[in-house]
Amino acid sequence: MKSGFISLIGRTNAGKSSLLNYLLNEKISMVSHKQNATRRKINGIVMHKDSQAIFIDTPGLHESNKTMNKLMVEAAIKSIGDCDLLLFVASVFDNIENYKKFLNLKKDAPHLIAITKIDEASDKEIFAKLNEYQIYSDEFKAIIPLSVKKQAYKNILLDEIYKYLPEHEYFYDPQYLTTANEREIFRDFILEAVYECVSDEVPYSTDVNVDKVVEKQNITEIYATIITDNEHHKAILIGKNGQTIKRIGINARKIINTLLNNKIFLKINVKIDKNWNSNESIIKKNFLY
């Protein structure tokens, strides 16, 4: 019996959240084409052979002077020291400089490399990228190309991870998919809908708080608040005659329905908190951890 923790590490938009959902065969982590979508660590639990692999989806590694972004990167780096194995995730189109920066981080755990989005590249491009990493073959244990869309090489990756998990009893019930509670997942799904429906800088000055969840026999009622930092962004989120907030609600319900069998009643309000994304204590307490 084996059990251990694996941290998913990589730049923003490398495909870490998509990879986690793929490994779980279930959507628990928000996915967006926008950078820095993942703001808090989410644990996903995968059973493979006689092992339990607990994957930690971390915020992407990036450079920024903003308080929120700095704390996100700190959370990602901290997870490196807490894990048995690291999985560096990079798109086949990513510059290898990102991997060099990763190697400069202090780490004791072994690591694998997952090269994602190979379905979008030619065989020539894939082989060229794999060859780039061979310069550092003494650093990593294995490099695995992956396609989430085509569902390719999943078991090869899990077999490699299995080799490096420590002998240990399971940390969680094998039936669990995640350590996140429903509110945390709902919050991420609503935020994903915000990212889908509004553009530019609005999502980066926005977060979501799930105020209340009421479970009834045939319906789940979710009451949430979108928090933003100024009147202009609030107006954009609501939209003319409330059309944007309505669209956010429709999209969020669709995403939440991938997880729940019940009907969904979702009530979303929008409020302003000018300091939410610059106050370190607020971020740590309510959003990041």
Swiss-Prot record:
Annotated Era-type G domain residues: 2-167
Annotated membrane topology: Peripheral membrane protein
Annotated segments matching region G1: 10-17
Span list, region G3: 57-60
Gene Ontology terms: biological process: ribosomal small subunit assembly
UniProt-annotated binding residues for GTP: 10-17, 57-61, 116-119
UniProt entry keywords in alphabetical sequence: Cell inner membrane, Cell membrane, Cytoplasm, GTP-binding, Membrane, Nucleotide-binding, Ribosome biogenesis, RNA-binding, rRNA-binding
One Pfam match: MMR_HSR1
Principal cellular location given in the protein's record: cytoplasm
Region (G5): 146-148
InterPro entries: G_ERA_dom, GTP-bd, GTPase_Era-like, KH_dom-like_a/b, KH_dom_type_2, KH_sf_prok-type, P-loop_NTPase, Small_GTP-bd
GO MF annotation list: GTP binding; GTPase activity; ribosomal small subunit binding; small ribosomal subunit rRNA binding
Span of domain KH type-2: 198-274
Keyword Membrane: yes
GO CC term, one of those recorded: cytosol
Keyword flag RNA-binding: yes
Renumbered residue ranges of the record's region G2: 36-40
Cellular compartment(s): Cytoplasm; Cell inner membrane
Annotated segments matching region G4: 116-119
PANTHER family: GTPASE ERA, GTPASE ERA, MITOCHONDRIAL
Subunit record text: Monomer.
NCBIfam families, sorted: era, PRK00089.1, small_GTP
Function description: An essential GTPase that binds both GDP and GTP, with rapid nucleotide exchange. Plays a role in 16S rRNA processing and 30S ribosomal subunit biogenesis and possibly also in cell cycle regulation and energy metabolism.
Matching HAMAP family: GTPase_Era
Family: Belongs to the TRAFAC class TrmE-Era-EngA-EngB-Septin-like GTPase superfamily. Era GTPase family.
Name of the featured protein: GTPase Era
Native source species: Campylobacter fetus subsp. fetus (strain 82-40)
Taxon lineage: Bacteria, Pseudomonadati, Campylobacterota, Epsilonproteobacteria, Campylobacterales
Gene that produces this protein: era
